[in-house]
Each structure stands twice: as C-alpha cells, then as structure tokens.
C-alpha cells in the first residue's frame, strides 16, 4: 500500500520553525503536469529561512544517525522499559510502537473496567506535570512521545517518574 500523496510538516524542522509540504507520487505529478497550471498555496510555503532550517534538520537527522539510533537503540529500549509498567495495579495494558507509548488506566485488571466518571487520565496527567513528566491523557489512556534523541538514562528516569505518577494516581483514586 502506497499513498498518492502525503502531507508533512513538523518533522521537517523538528518544530523549530513552521514548515509544511506535500509529497506526491510520480503518477500524480504527471497528471498535474498535463493539466497546466496548478494554482495552490500553503500557509508556510516558499519561506527561505524555513527551507534552510528544514534542510539543516534533515542533514542533522542523517549525519548524526538519529533515525538509525531510534530504530536500533532508543525505541526498543523505550518499549521494553514501558512494558515493565504492565504489572502496576492501575495499568490494564501498555502498548506502543517506535517512540510512542500508551498506558491504559483501569479500575480492574481482570475485566479492564475503567474508573467511570473519575477522570483517571486527567488525575494522572496532573501528577505527571507536577513531577516533571509530560504525558498526555486521552480519556483514561496516558500517551508518551519522547524526543528522538532521548538517552537510556533519560528513558529510565521517564519510566521511574511514570511509575511514581501511577502510584499517586492509584492513591488519589482510593486504590
């Protein structure tokens, strides 16, 4: 399966400056070229500073082997360490892929029933923020997306803080 077009943005500059674009398959480009002018615009198109930042960012990603390190070191280690949270009484499931992780908060591990109306995710999110950990709550699922350049020691700290915040959340929920 291959897309005909793909929009891209934040990753081009790692969010340092606004930039976006569209990657289009050759077959689509041929159709557009046969049709004459293709008048369009992007909010962040054609800016020379953004283009320079994007090129430099892509160079850094390539030359410093950041994506290779993510694939072989950071992502496998992050996923391994996140899975260690599965034994926590508040955790129904830990899932993830690459540098993304999700921790489902449940009332009962066996049935995976939720803390209905309790806002467990938002309670946990606040404990995370209070303890220097940025995790997003999507309902009662905690989402983590650390930077690509995170070290093993920083992943260890992330998981330690996540466990602390899970403990605090469990206590706040009366567990």
Question: What are these regions, as identified by a protein language model?
Answer:
Residues 1-175:
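Conserved N-terminal phosphate-binding loop of PLP-dependent enzymes in the Aspartate aminotransferase
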């Amino acid at each position: 399966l291959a897309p005909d077009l793909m929009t891209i943005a934040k990753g081009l500059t790692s969010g340092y400056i606004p930039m976006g674009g569209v990657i289009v398959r050759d077959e689509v480009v041929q159709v557009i070229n046969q049709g004459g002018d293709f008048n369009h615009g992007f909010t962040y198109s054609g800016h020379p500073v953004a283009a320079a930042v994007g090129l430099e960012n892509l160079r850094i990603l390539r030359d410093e082997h950041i994506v290779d390190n993510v694939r072989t070191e950071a992502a496998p280690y992050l996923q391994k360490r996140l899975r260690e949270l599965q034994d926590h009484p508040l955790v129904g499931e830990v899932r993830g892929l690459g540098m993304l992780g999700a921790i489902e908060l449940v009332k009962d591990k066996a049935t995976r029933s939720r803390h209905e109306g309790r806002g467990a995710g938002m309670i946990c999110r606040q404990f995370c923020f209070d303890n220097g950990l940025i995790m997003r709550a999507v309902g009662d699922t905690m989402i983590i997306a650390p930077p690509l350049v995170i070290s093993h020691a920083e992943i260890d700290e992330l998981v330690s803080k996540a466990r602390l915040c899970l403990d605090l959340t469990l206590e706040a929920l009366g567990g």
